[in-house]
């Protein structure tokens, strides 16, 4: 029986306050299986806070977060990851003094239940090595396999981090501003790479750059002052007058 289109991630009347200041104010949103869902909003909209609520960095003040129908509100990040949610960070989160292949190997080993140890010939684990090779090819990093992760270009580092997140074979992948700090060419490269490596997968992309979301995603939600202002197909959201006024500006009208 096909599971396409069923809810993978659900936010139900989600609230988050710090002290007496409300940041997230009643967000309800659904990400469905196979969907590429983009979340955009101006600076200060609450995007990072919402992202951290979903990934377990923060516990909600009120409301619920469901992953495949089970509540993950307030669950530690490592347990959320085990349940099938993987994320990349706005700032690269790699092992800079290890090679590209070693970074991927650690991610693959963790997914298959192996521990990284100096006393075990992990490179000889055929399944792990095969998966590492597959990811290197998908990420277009075969020629960089033995280079230190810290020596990669910034766009290559982001590609590697996304690959490490995908190596856990998640139910849903969360990307936090994957093109932040990139030139136009680097951004185009990373967007195309994300499109290729996440084909058929469920994706939630948090972005400030609306062009990235409109180019990559098939569903878009707009967060303004901690509330969902609009949600739907990218072309519908782009044409929404409220969105133009709140986020895109009159020049987008």
Outline where the language-model segments fall.
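Glycine-rich phosphate-binding loops of nucleotide-dependent enzymes
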Residues: 2-253
């Amino acid at each position: 029986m096909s599971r396409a289109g069923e809810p993978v991630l659900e936010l139900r009347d989600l609230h988050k306050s710090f002290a007496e200041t409300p940041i997230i104010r009643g967000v309800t949103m659904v990400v469905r299986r196979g969907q590429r869902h983009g979340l955009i909003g101006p600076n200060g909209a609450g995007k990072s806070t919402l992202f951290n609520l979903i990934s377990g960095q923060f516990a909600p003040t009120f409301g619920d977060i469901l992953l495949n129908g089970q509540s993950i509100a307030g669950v530690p990040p490592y347990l959320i990851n085990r349940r099938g949610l993987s994320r990349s960070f706005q700032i690269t989160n790699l092992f800079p003094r290890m090679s590209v292949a070693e970074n991927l190997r650690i991610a693959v080993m963790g997914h298959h239940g192996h521990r990284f140890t100096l006393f075990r010939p992990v490179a000889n684990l055929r399944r792990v090595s095969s998966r590492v090779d597959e990811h290197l090819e998908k990420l277009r990093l075969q020629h960089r396999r033995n280079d230190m992760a810290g020596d990669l270009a910034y766009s290559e580092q982001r590609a590697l981090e996304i690959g490490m997140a995908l190596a856990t074979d998640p139910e849903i992948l969360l990307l936090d501003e994957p093109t932040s700090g990139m030139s136009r060419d680097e951004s185009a490269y990373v967007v195309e790479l994300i499109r290729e490596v996440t084909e058929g997968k469920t994706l939630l992309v948090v972005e400030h750059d609306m062009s990235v979301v409109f180019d990559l995603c098939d569903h878009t939600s707009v967060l303004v002052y901690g509330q969902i202002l609009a949600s739907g197909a990218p072309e519908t959201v782009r044409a929404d007058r409220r969105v133009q006024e709140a986020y895109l500006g009159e020049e987008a009208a």
